[in-house]
């Protein structure tokens, strides 16, 4: 899957789950399961409930995503 195929949406972190997973509510009301991208993990960026984040979704599975940015 190339980088052009992903869908980027904004959302809000609802709750942290085990294994660095998060339940994220998207701006359109859908809830997705998202994990943290490698760059966020390498830079030790903390993600807490209530944070606004950008999530990349695959067009093949819209119920799972990757958190790629946390807004300040």
From Swiss-Prot:
Origin superkingdom: Bacteria
GO CC terms of this entry: cytosol
The keyword rRNA-binding is assigned to this record: yes
A molecular function GO annotation: translation initiation factor activity
Subunit relationships: Component of the 30S ribosomal translation pre-initiation complex which assembles on the 30S ribosome in the order IF-2 and IF-3, IF-1 and N-formylmethionyl-tRNA(fMet); mRNA recruitment can occur at any time during PIC assembly.
Residues covered by the S1-like domain: 1-72
Location(s) in or outside the cell: Cytoplasm
Coiled-coil residue windows: none
Protein name per the record: Translation initiation factor IF-1
Family per similarity comment: Belongs to the IF-1 family.
Job description of the protein: One of the essential components for the initiation of protein synthesis. Stabilizes the binding of IF-2 and IF-3 on the 30S subunit to which N-formylmethionyl-tRNA(fMet) subsequently binds. Helps modulate mRNA selection, yielding the 30S pre-initiation complex (PIC). Upon addition of the 50S ribosomal subunit IF-1, IF-2 and IF-3 are released leaving the mature 70S translation initiation complex.
PROSITE patterns, sorted: S1_IF1_TYPE (PS50832)
UniProt keyword terms in alphabetical order: Cytoplasm, Initiation factor, Protein biosynthesis, RNA-binding, rRNA-binding
Entries under HAMAP family matching the protein: IF_1
Listed InterPro entries: NA-bd_OB-fold (IPR012340), RNA-binding_domain_S1_IF1 (IPR006196), S1_domain (IPR003029), TIF_IF1 (IPR004368)
Chaperone as UniProt keyword: no
């Amino acid at each position: 899957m190339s980088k052009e195929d992903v869908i980027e949406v904004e959302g809000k972190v609802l709750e942290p789950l085990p294994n660095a997973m998060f339940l994220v509510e998207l701006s359109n009301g859908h809830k997705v399961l998202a994990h943290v991208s490698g760059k966020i993990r390498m830079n030790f960026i903390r993600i807490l409930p209530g944070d606004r984040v950008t999530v990349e979704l695959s067009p093949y599975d819209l119920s799972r995503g990757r958190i790629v940015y946390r807004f300040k």
